[in-house]
């Protein structure tokens, strides 16, 4: 299962690959044309000062030696240890050259088998022309493919808002129904169980729902199932979510500031913020009110708000009130107005982290 997930990540990184993305180089030479075909997508809406490079397998030894040398001096690797590559890196004024996916000691063999260890992220001067940088690197024999670090955009810029205290009262018929769980707002979740109550929604139509009531008769969740929410951060302290959060026990019981479980990430208690490379956040906004919208928490609630606990709403797989809901792993790929939010690199790291740490969905 996880092997397939890792291969899927590799496929996603090369999903835009095509044979005619770019035309001949400026000199019209066939060598430039062949080199440009290593570039698998376009620079439209790409992160400035960033490229994802897939190196030839023969180059990895030198890259890893250069990384080890930098680590010994507690510095950041900026060169590959390969003359032809380093000439270009120097020209681009590269400030960091790191593996896209940090070493997870538990899964490194699987990672290497899938070829994911060959992906590196380059950071360089944001004033450098991305297309020119990609063209220069693509001409190097040790470079197999190049991908622009595309920025993904949220489909919705609104805010998740709490239920209004003055929400319309439900009809007597709706109030008199015996509901499967005692969460007070389940009655308003018409998309779960639609009784056709016009007081809940003017367009309510009985039976127009997801049939969750029948599903709950089979199961309301399973704590062995981990669901990764790749979104904004999840408010893991929320009273209707806290008990259903995935917990990285080795980090939780380990030493602060140390990667206790060897998965490549430090203090990832409930997941990780792949944008800021730090703690999960869910309420970061700027002075204009732009930033986190609460969507990650909203999504987590739809999946696994705790059922039958007498508060809030129900989750589709939130359990029956016996600590039997699925577990939510927060893989934060959108973070306020932070630079790098929602890029291909961030999304790829989030997906691989989920696979490496046991997420099923």
Could you say what each language-model-derived stretch is?
Residues 3-9:
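Sec-dependent signal peptide recognition
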Residues 14-16:
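C-terminal motif of bacterial Sec signal peptides marking the signal peptidase cleavage site
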Residues 18-21:
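Bacterial signal peptide processing site
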Residues 27-171, 214:
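Inhibitory N-terminal propeptides of secreted protease zymogens
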Residues 79, 124-131, 206-209, 224, ...:
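Soluble non-cytosolic domains of exported or imported proteins
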Residues 82, 86, 130-134, 212, ...:
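Extracytoplasmic/secreted envelope proteins and their assembly/folding machinery
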Residues 106-121, 135-226, 234-240, 244, ...:
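Protease zymogen maturation seam
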Residues 213-344, 357-360:
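Subtilisin-like serine protease catalytic core
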């Amino acid at each position: 299962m996880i092997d397939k997930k890792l291969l899927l990540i590799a496929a996603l990184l090369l999903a835009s690959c095509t044979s005619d993305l770019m035309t001949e180089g400026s000199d019209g030479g066939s060598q430039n044309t062949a080199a440009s075909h290593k570039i698998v997508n376009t620079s439209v809406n790409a992160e400035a000062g960033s490229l994802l490079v897939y190196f030839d397998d023969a180059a990895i030894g030198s890259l890893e030696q250069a990384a080890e040398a930098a680590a010994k001096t507690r510095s950041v690797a900026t060169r590959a240890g390969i003359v032809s590559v380093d000439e270009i890196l120097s020209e681009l004024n590269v400030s960091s050259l790191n593996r896209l996916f940090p070493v997870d000691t538990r899964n490194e063999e699987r990672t290497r088998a899938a070829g994911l260890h060959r992906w590196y992220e380059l950071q360089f001067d944001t004033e450098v022309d991305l297309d020119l940088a990609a063209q220069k690197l693509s001409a190097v024999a040790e470079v197999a493919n190049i991908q622009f670090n595309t920025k993904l955009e949220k489909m919705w810029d609104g805010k998740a808002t709490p239920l209004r205290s003055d929400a319309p009262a439900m009809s007597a018929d709706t109030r008199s129904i015996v509901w499967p769980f005692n969460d007070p707002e389940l009655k308003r979740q018409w998309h779960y169980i639609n009784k056709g109550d016009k007081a809940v929604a003017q367009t309510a139509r009985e039976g127009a729902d997801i049939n969750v009531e029948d599903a709950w008769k089979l199961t309301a969740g399973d704590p062995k199932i981990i669901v990764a929410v790749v979104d904004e951060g999840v408010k893991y302290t929320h009273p209707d979510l806290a008990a259903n959060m995935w917990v990285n026990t080795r980090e939780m019981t380990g030493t602060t500031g140390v990667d206790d479980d060897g998965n490549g990430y430090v203090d990832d208690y409930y997941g990780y913020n792949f944008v800021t490379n730090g703690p999960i956040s869910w309420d970061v906004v700027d002075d204009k009110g732009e930033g986190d919208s609460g969507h990650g928490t909203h999504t987590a609630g739809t999946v696994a708000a705790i059922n039958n606990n007498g508060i809030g709403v129900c989750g589709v797989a939130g359990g029956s009130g016996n600590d039997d809901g699925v577990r939510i792993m927060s893989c934060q790929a959108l973070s306020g107005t932070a630079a790098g939010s929602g890029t291909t690199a961030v999304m790829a790291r989030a997906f691989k982290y989920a696979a490496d740490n046991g997420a099923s969905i």
